C-alpha cells in the first residue's frame, strides 16, 4: 500500500507527462501481480469498489477530531481526502503504529466484499495505522475519487514502456482486461 500511495502522490503532483509515464512504468516493474493490475485499474478508474460516501467519512472523522476544527480545516484546505489525511489523529497505541497495511490487492478485495458498516470500521482501522500519504490514498480509494491526472491513454503508454510492447498491441487488448479480485484468484 505504501508504494501505491507514493505512486499516487507522484502522479498527482508531477506535471510532466513523461515523468508520469516513467513513474508508472517503474511501479509496474517493481510491483508483483496482482497488485500491479489492481493499481492499473484504480488509476484508470476501471475498478468497481464499495465506496463510502463523503458524509460517512466526514462523520467518521468528526468522531475522532473536534467537529469545528474539521469544518474549518476542510474550508481552508478544500479537499476532503487531504483534510482528513492531515487532521486524522496520530494513534498513540504503538501496536497499531507497527501494524502492517494490506497489500493493494488485499485492500481492494476488502473494499469489494465488506458491508457498508464493516467498511467504516475497516477504514477507521486502516487510517489509524497509516501515514499521511497512505491515508490520502486510502481515502481516495474508498470514496472512488481517484483522479490523479492520468488518462487511460497515458496508462497504456506507460504499460507499453514497461513491457517493451508496441502501444497498438496494448490498445488492441485493453477492452479485454478485467480488474476484479476474481481474475486475480484465477491466476
Q: Where are the regions that the model predicts?
A:
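A short, hydrophobic C-terminal helix/tail in secreted or cell-surface proteins
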Residues: 182-187
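N-terminal nucleic-acid-engaging modules of covalent nucleotidyltransferase systems
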Residues: 1-181
Amino acid at each position: 500500500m505504501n508504494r501505491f500511495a507514493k505512486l499516487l502522490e507522484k502522479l498527482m503532483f508531477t506535471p510532466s507527462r513523461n515523468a508520469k509515464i516513467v513513474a508508472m512504468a517503474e511501479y509496474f516493474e517493481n510491483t508483483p501481480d496482482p497488485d500491479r493490475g489492481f493499481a492499473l485499474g484504480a488509476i484508470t478508474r476501471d475498478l468497481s469498489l464499495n465506496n463510502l460516501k463523503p458524509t460517512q467519512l466526514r462523520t467518521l472523522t468528526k468522531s475522532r477530531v473536534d467537529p469545528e476544527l474539521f469544518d474549518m480545516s476542510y474550508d481552508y484546505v478544500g479537499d476532503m481526502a487531504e483534510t482528513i489525511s492531515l487532521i486524522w489523529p496520530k494513534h498513540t497505541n504503538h501496536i497499531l503504529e507497527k501494524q502492517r497495511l494490506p497489500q493493494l490487492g488485499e485492500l481492494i478485495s476488502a473494499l469489494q466484499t465488506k458491508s457498508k458498516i464493516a467498511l467504516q470500521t475497516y477504514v477507521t482501522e486502516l487510517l489509524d495505522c497509516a501515514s499521511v500519504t497512505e491515508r490520502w490514498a486510502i481515502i481516495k480509494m474508498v470514496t472512488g475519487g481517484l483522479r490523479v491526472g492520468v488518462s487511460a491513454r497515458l496508462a497504456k503508454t506507460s504499460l507499453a514502456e514497461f513491457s517493451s510492447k508496441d502501444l497498438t498491441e496494448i490498445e488492441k487488448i485493453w477492452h479485454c482486461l478485467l480488474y476484479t479480485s476474481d481474475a486475480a484468484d484465477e491466476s
